[in-house]
C-alpha cells in the first residue's frame, strides 16, 4: 500500500518485499535434589525438628533469530540472539526449636555455588512469641541473593540509535559545543549481555504482631525493611559518554581514524551492557483485618489487606559517573504509597459469591529525562497520576465432586485507568502499564476440576 498516493503496489512489488522467517529458541533445565527431615531431641515446648537438602541444577538458553535478521536484511523488528549456560550446587539446613510452649525459634542457612559468578551463603533467623492465647509477636532477619539471569549474561548484541552532540569531537575540532556548528546526530548504541555479572545481594528484616480475640476477628500488623545492593541495571548513556568518549582508544566508545592533526576520530558506536551498580532500600507497613461469621444460613468472610510504603530510596550513578546519588522514589512514578485489597465472600451450601475491591494510590507522573538519561526528580515536579479502583464480582457453584463452576465480571464498573504521560518509551498509551490494567469490563466463565 502506498500511503502517499491513490494506487496500490502491484503484487510483484509486494512479493519482492515479503519473506518468511524462522526463529529457533530452546531452554533446558535439569535438576536433581535430595531432602531429609525429622526430629532431633525434645525441648520444653516440644520436639526440635531439622530439615536439610542438596540440589544440583543445569540450565541453558539459546535463541537464534532468522539468518535474514542476522545479515541485516530485515528492518524495524527486534531480533536479538542469546546463548548462555551454567550449573550450580546448593545445600540448605533448617532447625525448628520450640524453646518454650510460647516461644519458637527457626534457624536456617543456604549455600549456593554457581559456575559463572561464584558462591554465596545466606542465613535466616525468625522467632514467634505467644504470651497469651490469640496474641503473638513475630520477627525475622535474613539475607538473600538473585543470580543474574542467563539472558543478562548471554544476550547477543542489538543496536539502537541515540540523538546527541558529540561535544568531545566538537572541542577537538575547535568548535564551541554550545554553538549551532556543533550539530547533534544519530549515533549507534550497541547493547549486549555481560558474562562478568555478580549476584544481587539483599538483607531483610520484619517485625509484627497478630491478634485473634475470638473465632470471628483476626488482626495483624507488620513492619518490613528490605535493602539491596549490587543491583543489576543497564549503564546509563550519559555515564558511558562522559567516562569513555573523551579518548581515541576505548573498548566502550568506538571512534574512526582521526584526520591528520586531529586527536579524535568521528564517533562510530558506543558499547553498553548490564553492570552491578547502585543500591536500593524500601520499608513499609502491612495491615490486615479479617472477619468471619455465620450470616443468613451461610458463611460470611470480609478481609482487608492494606500496604503502606513508607520509603523507597535508590542510589545510582550520577551523570558523570563520579559518585552515587540517593533519590527518594516514594510516591514517584510507579511507586504509589498506598494499596489495598478488600474482599467479601459469602457461601451457602454449594453456592457462593465474592466481591473484590482493588485500590492503587496516586503517584507522580514521570519527570523529564535529561540528556544523561537520569530522571530529574528533584527539579521537575510533574503532574499527578490519580488513584485507580476496580471492582471484581464472581459467583460459583461447587455441587459436583472436584468441579467448580464460576461466572465473573472483572472491572465490573468499567473503570478506565488514570491518564499518564509516562516515560515516552514503554508507556505510550496514556496509562502506566506496569501498575494499571487497561482492560475494561471483562465477563468470563471458568471451570476448575481437581483430582
Give residue ranges: language-model regions.
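Surface-exposed, low-complexity loop segments enriched in small/polar and acidic residues
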Residues: 1-88, 146-199, 220-283, 318, ...
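Hydrophobic, lipid-facing positions within transmembrane beta-strands of outer-membrane proteins
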Residues: 28-34, 89-95, 121-127, 193, ...
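Transmembrane beta-strands of outer-membrane beta-barrel pores
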Residues: 40, 56-62, 109-115, 141-147, ...
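Short loop/turn motifs that connect adjacent beta-strands in outer-membrane beta-barrel proteins
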Residues: 41-48, 99-103, 134, 215-216, ...
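Transmembrane beta-strands of outer-membrane beta-barrel proteins
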Residues: 48-54, 105-107, 123, 137-139, ...
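Surface-exposed extracellular loop regions of Gram-negative outer-membrane beta-barrel proteins
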Residues: 50-54, 82-132, 202, 356-358
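C-terminal beta-barrel architecture of Gram-negative outer-membrane proteins
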Residues: 160, 298-398, 413-414
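C-terminal beta-signal and adjacent terminal beta-strands/loops
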Residues: 218, 310-311, 358-371, 397-451
Amino acid at each position: 500500500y502506498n500511503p502517499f498516493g491513490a494506487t496500490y503496489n502491484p503484487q510483484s512489488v509486494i512479493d519482492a518485499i515479503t519473506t518468511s522467517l524462522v526463529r529457533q529458541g530452546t531452554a533446558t533445565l535439569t535438576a536433581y535434589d535430595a531432602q531429609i527431615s525429622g526430629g532431633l531431641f525434645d525441648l520444653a515446648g516440644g520436639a526440635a525438628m531439622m530439615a536439610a537438602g542438596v540440589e544440583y541444577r543445569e540450565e541453558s538458553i539459546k535463541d537464534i533469530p532468522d539468518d535474514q535478521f542476522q545479515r541485516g536484511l530485515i528492518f524495524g523488528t527486534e531480533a536479538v540472539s542469546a546463548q548462555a549456560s551454567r550449573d550450580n550446587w546448593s545445600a540448605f539446613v533448617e532447625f525448628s526449636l520450640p524453646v518454650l510452649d510460647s516461644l519458637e525459634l527457626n534457624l536456617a542457612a543456604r549455600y549456593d555455588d554457581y559456575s559463572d559468578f561464584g558462591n554465596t551463603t545466606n542465613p535466616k533467623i525468625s522467632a514467634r512469641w505467644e504470651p497469651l492465647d490469640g496474641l503473638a509477636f513475630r520477627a525475622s532477619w535474613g539475607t538473600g541473593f538473585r543470580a543474574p539471569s542467563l539472558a543478562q549474561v548471554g544476550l547477543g548484541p542489538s543496536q539502537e540509535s541515540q540523538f546527541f552532540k558529540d561535544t568531545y569531537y566538537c572541542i577537538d575540532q575547535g568548535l564551541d559545543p554550545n554553538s549551532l556548528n556543533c550539530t547533534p546526530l544519530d549515533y549507534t548504541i550497541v547493547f549486549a549481555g555481560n558474562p562478568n555479572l555478580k549476584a544481587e545481594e539483599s538483607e531483610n528484616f520484619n517485625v509484627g504482631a497478630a491478634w485473634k480475640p475470638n473465632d470471628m476477628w483476626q488482626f495483624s500488623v507488620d513492619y518490613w525493611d528490605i535493602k539491596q545492593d549490587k543491583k543489576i541495571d543497564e549503564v546509563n548513556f550519559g555515564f558511558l559518554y562522559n567516562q569513555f568518549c573523551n579518548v581515541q582508544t576505548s573498548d566502550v566508545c568506538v571512534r574512526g581514524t582521526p584526520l591528520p592533526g586531529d586527536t579524535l576520530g568521528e564517533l562510530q558506536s558506543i558499547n553498553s551492557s548490564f553492570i552491578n551498580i547502585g543500591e536500593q532500600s524500601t520499608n513499609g507497613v502491612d495491615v490486615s483485618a479479617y472477619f468471619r461469621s455465620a450470616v443468613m444460613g451461610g458463611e460470611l468472610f470480609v478481609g482487608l489487606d492494606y500496604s503502606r510504603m513508607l520509603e523507597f530510596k535508590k542510589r545510582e550513578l550520577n551523570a558523570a559517573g563520579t559518585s552515587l546519588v540517593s533519590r527518594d522514589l516514594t510516591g514517584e512514578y510507579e511507586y504509589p504509597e498506598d494499596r489495598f485489597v478488600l474482599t467479601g465472600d459469602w457461601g451457602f451450601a454449594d453456592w457462593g459469591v465474592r466481591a473484590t475491591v482493588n485500590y492503587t494510590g496516586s503517584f507522580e507522573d514521570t519527570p523529564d529525562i535529561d540528556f544523561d538519561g537520569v530522571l530529574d526528580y528533584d527539579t521537575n515536579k510533574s503532574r499527578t497520576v490519580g488513584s485507580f479502583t476496580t471492582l471484581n464480582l464472581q459467583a460459583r457453584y461447587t455441587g459436583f465432586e472436584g468441579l467448580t463452576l464460576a461466572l465473573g465480571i472483572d472491572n465490573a464498573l468499567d473503570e478506565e485507568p488514570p491518564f499518564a504521560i509516562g516515560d515516552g518509551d514503554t508507556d505510550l498509551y496514556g496509562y502506566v502499564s506496569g501498575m494499571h490494567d487497561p482492560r475494561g469490563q471483562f465477563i468470563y466463565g471458568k471451570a476448575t476440576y481437581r483430582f
